[in-house]
């Protein structure tokens, strides 16, 4: 059965399906939208008591519901100054060292940091022998992405690619999954060196957005695009620890990269399959 599921992943028109779902998710369809939201809440056991707007009727589109805000204070940002924090609600897929430019995906599968970053050798070099963490966001999760540490945006890269589903089955069977799927790479300058936040798309991910550029995907293309940003002066964009930096509309996975010697160790509860909550301690900063 698993082989059939993987074969279907290769065969189905993933981009077409994703864009059609995206159009439906953005449409205002009144009672149809409300019914879809109610079904989704029941199907995935979503705790709407955490949402700033708890009523399904409060959302005019499915996208509005999916990117719903939380009540103020529901995800407090850890005040431990020697720790970075979880950027999202989700589950840890993998975390650990970047060895010889390779990132661990699943048993028997690795991919290169160079490929993940859109074959930008100068960017990949900054993360040689550093650390990575991959966090998967399930449909039930809060889908806004926040800063693990205060940082100033220096670069954003859009990398075209596939739109395979992201789950344990595909991670174990699709080589280089996160370096094959469409993604947006944001690089920040922080007190512990460069940090990459890679927002990875997947099947039926309607769009990837950042707070500075709005919707980055779609539209899509076959070219890698890079935008450079000033890190000093009035035009520089600096985001505080815990500040929102982006969001997924029906979305997927965040891969974080850190430079060599930036992190001392991951928090004790940060292990594969561990549930994450945005704002909680994630990794200790190297002294």
From Swiss-Prot:
One Gene Ontology MF term: phosphatidylserine decarboxylase activity
Protein name per UniProt: Phosphatidylserine decarboxylase proenzyme
Main location: membrane
Cofactor descriptive note: Binds 1 pyruvoyl group covalently per subunit.
Modification type Pyruvic acid (Ser): residues: 252
Cofactors: pyruvate
Entry keywords, A to Z: Cell membrane, Decarboxylase, Lipid biosynthesis, Lipid metabolism, Lyase, Membrane, Phospholipid biosynthesis, Phospholipid metabolism, Pyruvate, Zymogen
Organism per entry: Shewanella woodyi (strain ATCC 51908 / MS32)
One cellular component (GO) term of this entry: plasma membrane
Record-stated family: Belongs to the phosphatidylserine decarboxylase family. PSD-B subfamily. Prokaryotic type I sub-subfamily.
Site feature Cleavage (non-hydrolytic), where: 251-252
InterPro entries in alphabetical order: PS_Dcarbxylase, PSD-B, PSD_type1_pro
Reactions the enzyme catalyzes: a 1,2-diacyl-sn-glycero-3-phospho-L-serine + H(+) = a 1,2-diacyl-sn-glycero-3-phosphoethanolamine + CO2
Role this protein plays: Catalyzes the formation of phosphatidylethanolamine (PtdEtn) from phosphatidylserine (PtdSer).
Transmembrane segments: none
Any one GO biological process: phosphatidylethanolamine biosynthetic process
Top-rank EC class of the record's enzyme: lyase
Known pathway: Phospholipid metabolism; phosphatidylethanolamine biosynthesis; phosphatidylethanolamine from CDP-diacylglycerol: step 2/2
Membrane disposition: Peripheral membrane protein
Subunit architecture: Heterodimer of a large membrane-associated beta subunit and a small pyruvoyl-containing alpha subunit.
Active-site residues, Swiss-Prot/TrEMBL: 89 (charge relay system), 146 (charge relay system), 252 (charge relay system), 252 (schiff-base intermediate with substrate)
Domain of life of the native organism: Bacteria
E.C. no: 4.1.1.65
Compartments, record wording: Cell membrane
């Amino acid at each position: 059965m698993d082989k059939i599921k993987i074969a279907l992943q290769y065969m189905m028109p993933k981009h077409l399906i994703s864009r059609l779902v995206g159009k439906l998710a953005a449409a205002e369809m009144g009672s149809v939208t409300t019914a879809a939201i109610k079904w989704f809440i029941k199907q995935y056991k979503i705790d709407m008591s955490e949402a700033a707007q708890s009523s399904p009727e409060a959302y005019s589109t499915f996208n509005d519901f999916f990117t719903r805000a939380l009540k103020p204070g529901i995800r407090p940002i850890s005040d431990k100054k020697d720790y970075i924090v979880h950027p999202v609600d989700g589950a840890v897929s993998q975390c650990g060292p970047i060895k010889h430019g390779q990132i661990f995906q699943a048993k028997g599968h690795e991919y290169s940091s160079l490929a993940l970053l859109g074959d930008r050798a100068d960017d990949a070099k900054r993360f040689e022998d550093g650390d990575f963490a991959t966090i998967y966001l399930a449909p039930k999760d809060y889908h806004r992405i926040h800063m693990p540490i205060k940082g100033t945006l220096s670069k954003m890269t859009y990398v075209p690619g596939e739109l395979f589903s992201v789950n344990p089955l595909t991670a174990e069977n699709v080589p280089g999954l996160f370096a094959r799927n469409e993604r947006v790479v944001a690089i920040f300058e922080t007190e512990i060196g460069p940090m990459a936040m890679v927002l990875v798309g997947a099947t039926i991910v309607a769009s990837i957005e950042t707070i500075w550029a709005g919707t980055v995907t779609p539209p899509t293309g076959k070219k890698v695009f890079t935008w450079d940003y000033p890190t000093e002066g009035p035009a520089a964009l600096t985001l505080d620890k815990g500040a929102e930096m982006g969001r997924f509309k029906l979305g997927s996975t965040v891969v974080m990269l850190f430079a060599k010697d930036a992190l001392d160790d991951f928090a004790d509860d940060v292990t594969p399959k561990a549930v994450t909550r945005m704002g909680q301690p994630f990794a200790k900063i190297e002294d």
